[in-house]
Amino acid sequence: MFEKLSCHTSIKIGGRVKYLVLPNDVFSLERAITVLKDLPFQIMGLGTNLLVQDEDLDIAVLKTERLNQIEIKGEKVLVESGTPLKRLCLFLMEAELGGLEFAYGIPGSVGGAIYMNAGAYGGEIGEFVEAVEVLRDGEKTWLSRNEIFFGYRDSTFKREKLIITRVMMSFKKEKKETIKAKMDDYMRRRLEKQPLDLPSAGSVFKRPREDFYVGKAIESLGLKGYRIGGAQISEKHAGFIVNAGSATFDDVMKLIDFVRKKVKEKYGVELETEVEIWWNGRRW
């Protein structure tokens, strides 16, 4: 009955949950929510920007990875929320639709990316959204772009109880070779700078302001490689915390708190976490 979430998060941390449900389509997701209406639940995409407590959680988790259909409609694309971002980027390249190249190499699902308005290299996924289909109190409805707020690593979906099911996105025609060259460049930069060889939950902290680079600030404090238990500030990019071996939820949380304290002391800046935290069955 119980399923370890450490097998479903990119940082390889997480306790057991009562039920892990993998709906095959949007209808199955709706049905699962109806069945689980009296049991607390959380939605998970690919678990790539997520830190989960080690203790058992008395909840169900609905994992959307099987909701991965993509349809092309001219310069518009309808994509299900569990679709990996990498797969969407490759699909767009083949369709000669440009704009999302910056997202190539960002781990995670389309739904998770929309939820947090994921971005990199000056681009954000919210720029390409035309409408989002959601489940609100179990009812399916579409939100148009002017009904949706997107901010820096923030969106309507973080503030309201909405479950993203499908997204309509709009792109511009561009040559496949041009798109591929951009994607290859972004991937090369990621491989050079990010610790993709070790389990992590991605970038840990939000940038507090445009001119403040968190990784460089942490590095300036001499904290690259600093370790608490099995959690370590990456030696490659100080904005990442990696699981260097049997790290626990508490190890990572203590390291996050330590970094926040040191940055506050040196720079007077309060760091907010970008990574999503599940503790006591709630999102933080």
From Swiss-Prot:
One of its GO terms (cellular component) is cytosol. Pathway: Cell wall biogenesis; peptidoglycan biosynthesis. It is found in: Cytoplasm. It catalyses: UDP-N-acetyl-alpha-D-muramate + NADP(+) = UDP-N-acetyl-3-O-(1-carboxyvinyl)-alpha-D-glucosamine + NADPH + H(+). The active site is at 153, 203 (proton donor), 274. Transmembrane segments: none annotated. PROSITE patterns: FAD_PCMH (PS51387). Keywords: Cell cycle, Cell division, Cell shape, Cell wall biogenesis/degradation, Cytoplasm, FAD, Flavoprotein, NADP, Oxidoreductase, Peptidoglycan synthesis. It holds the Pfam family MurB_C. Its EC number is 1.3.1.98. Its cofactor is FAD. InterPro entries: FAD-bd_PCMH (IPR016166), FAD-bd_PCMH-like_sf (IPR036318), FAD-bd_PCMH_sub1 (IPR016167), FAD-bd_PCMH_sub2 (IPR016169), MurB (IPR003170), MurB_C (IPR011601), MurB_C_sf (IPR036635), Oxid_FAD_bind_N (IPR006094). Cell wall formation. Belongs to the MurB family. This is UDP-N-acetylenolpyruvoylglucosamine reductase. It comes from Thermotoga maritima (strain ATCC 43589 / DSM 3109 / JCM 10099 / NBRC 100826 / MSB8). The gene is murB.
